[in-house]
Amino acid sequence: MNIIKANVAAPDARVAITIARFNQFINDSLLDGAVDALTRIGQVKDDNITVVWVPGAYELPLATEALAKSGKYDAVVALGTVIRGGTAHFEYVAGGASNGLASVAQDSGVPVAFGVLTTESIEQAIERAGTKAGNKGAEAALTALEMINVLKAIKA
């Protein structure tokens, strides 16, 4: 039996981060966590990280697709926060972002890590952006690095 596993060290990786401006006070913490994980744990060089800001979570898939198709990046980390309100808007935005990002990864073959918080409240979002529940931006960054290495191992 062959087993493929990978670690998160990827010092030569080129990683793009797409990040939503809407709910920026939360997303800034996700970005800090992602960059810290990439550089400190993954050993990615700061010059090999590109950050692209978009208006909101719904716009993440299009920017992520452009980055994935550019051939310049080994992975893309998508960061944002969608907080449920009193209308169906949450479902449209969260579902559109989630489905769109999954499609980008499948269509491009470039790992896309999902670091979009979908929460019931601002408090839940804050907890997941570096307080009680860890930092989901950091987790997404590490997922991207691991997937870079998994795909390399599969192709080897």
Curated annotation (Swiss-Prot):
Keywords: Riboflavin biosynthesis, Transferase
UniProt catalytic activity: (2S)-2-hydroxy-3-oxobutyl phosphate + 5-amino-6-(D-ribitylamino)uracil = 6,7-dimethyl-8-(1-D-ribityl)lumazine + phosphate + 2 H2O + H(+)
Chain ranges passing through the membrane: none
Positions annotated to bind 5-amino-6-(D-ribitylamino)uracil: 22, 57-59, 81-83, 114
Single annotated GO MF: 6,7-dimethyl-8-ribityllumazine synthase activity
Tagged with keyword Nucleus: no
Known pathway: Cofactor biosynthesis; riboflavin biosynthesis; riboflavin from 2-hydroxy-3-oxobutyl phosphate and 5-amino-6-(D-ribitylamino)uracil: step 1/2
Function according to Swiss-Prot or TrEMBL: Catalyzes the formation of 6,7-dimethyl-8-ribityllumazine by condensation of 5-amino-6-(D-ribitylamino)uracil with 3,4-dihydroxy-2-butanone 4-phosphate. This is the penultimate step in the biosynthesis of riboflavin.
Family: Belongs to the DMRL synthase family.
Protein name per UniProt: 6,7-dimethyl-8-ribityllumazine synthase
Gene behind this protein: ribH
